[in-house]
């Protein structure tokens, strides 16, 4: 069996090209009109809107303005800087492992897995049907849309980049484009992207700060643990997280006017003399 050659230059090109596509999916030129049908039911309207939104996400870079390119420069610079120090940061994270962090891994990692994220969306939608909540249904459907859109893009770039995972023993600059093997699907991180794609939609649909903190906090832990568990390099999780965040933002913005009634999910903590009540409003 021959030894694959490392392609640091090719890897850098693929990495930069991907970063050029990722940022500012949250700033689309196309938005729903106020008369759009509400996207809070799993029906033909939803699937039609899903297709339109997917096309808008893919075409986003063609609508960038000057401010978008300036913001891209900042994000790309951060990503390239991480790429240059991937090995050093990865080694440092490995040295910080403790028995507690290792034991927590199986639980935290679940929040980035596609099966669990899909199950979360299904559970939210079912709850929306049971409680007749357009807000919960819409949050569920947009979460699913954001996750599936993000996943489609992630899988494409994984195949094109073919970056070696840390656990293969190869360097942080080892790329094998179109190898289609699990050991060469490190860039970008699908779990980090999926976690942030859903967390962002949930945060956008709820006005409560503590929900934002919880959603983004869990997504952040998922990203960190992908490096902790030797599955990804730091630049993989940074790019995946950025992708999930901006796709989630854009999906939310594209559907911000397609609502019926109260489309937000609201929480309220009420202290009492001998108890605390958590109220959920749809």
Regions found by a protein language model. Give the residues of each.
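Long, hydrophobic/aromatic-enriched structural stretches that serve as scaffold segments
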Residues: 121-124
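Alpha-helical transmembrane segments of multi-pass membrane proteins
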Residues: 79-87
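Interfacial/capping segments of alpha-helical transmembrane domains
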Residues: 86-97
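Alpha-helical transmembrane segments
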Residues: 72-76
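A short, ordered amphipathic alpha-helix with a cationic face
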Residues: 43-47, 79, 91-93
